[in-house]
């Protein structure tokens, strides 16, 4: 019967295996997307709540010390603000796609989601990279510009920022994996098996 229609049995078996692989890739996507949502939401919340105060004696007048309180907040650095916004957008987007994934099953919407995933990956990667750059500056300073490191005085602020950065970079890696899964699931049949 298959030979009458012009298909060989091995081609049918290969097509069946390809569909099984695509089905597995499609069922894996919501799990990875949920992990991306959690990682980016944790990063946004931790950095958004990151604040520490440090009080030091700046002078002694007579016998009374004069103290000054310094506060480190994420809002003081535009890179950290961008980091929080990028992670919040990424977590909101992934939550929206998780909620509406039944509607987005058709191929046209699936390709739109794939393109938006690439945009979100780019936004998330740039937000994480800019925040990592500022975190490195806060930790090590810049001796040429005479910017002293601040992590020796604001240890908790720097530790929370580091946790947020790690969570965000995990989100970037998972978002990249999600893009690869989506590309493989949306690819033509010949590209999935490497034929």
Curated annotation (Swiss-Prot):
InterPro entries: CASP/CASPL, CASP_dom, CASPL. The chain crosses the membrane at residues 26-46, 79-99, 115-135, 161-181. It is a multi-pass membrane protein. Residues 1-25, 100-114, 182-195 are cytoplasmic. It holds the Pfam family CASP_dom. GO terms for cellular component: plasma membrane. Residues 47-78, 136-160 are extracellular. It is found in: Cell membrane. Keywords: Cell membrane, Membrane, Transmembrane, Transmembrane helix. The keyword Cell membrane applies. Homodimer and heterodimers. Belongs to the Casparian strip membrane proteins (CASP) family. This is CASP-like protein 1B1. The lineage of its organism: Eukaryota, Viridiplantae, Streptophyta, Embryophyta, Tracheophyta.
């Amino acid at each position: 019967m298959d030979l009458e229609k012009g298909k060989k049995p091995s081609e049918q078996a290969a097509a069946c295996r390809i569909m099984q692989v695509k089905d597995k890739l499609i069922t894996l996507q919501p799990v990875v997307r949920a992990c991306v949502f959690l990682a980016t939401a944790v990063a946004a919340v931790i950095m958004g709540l990151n604040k520490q105060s440090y009080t030091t004696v700046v002078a002694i007048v007579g016998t009374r010390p004069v103290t000054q309180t310094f506060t480190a907040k994420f809002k003081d650095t535009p890179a950290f603000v961008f980091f929080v916004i990028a992670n919040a957008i990424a977590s909101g987007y992934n939550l929206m796609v998780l909620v509406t994934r039944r509607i987005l099953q058709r191929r046209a919407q699936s390709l739109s989601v794939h393109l938006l995933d690439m945009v979100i990956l780019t936004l998330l990667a740039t937000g994480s990279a800019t925040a990592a750059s500022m975190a490195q500056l806060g930790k090590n300073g810049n001796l040429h510009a005479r910017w002293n490191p601040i992590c020796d005085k604001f240890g908790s602020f720097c530790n929370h920022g580091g946790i947020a950065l790690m969570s965000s970079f995990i989100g970037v890696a998972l978002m990249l994996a999600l893009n690869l899964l989506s590309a493989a699931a949306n690819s033509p049949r010949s590209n999935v098996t490497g034929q």
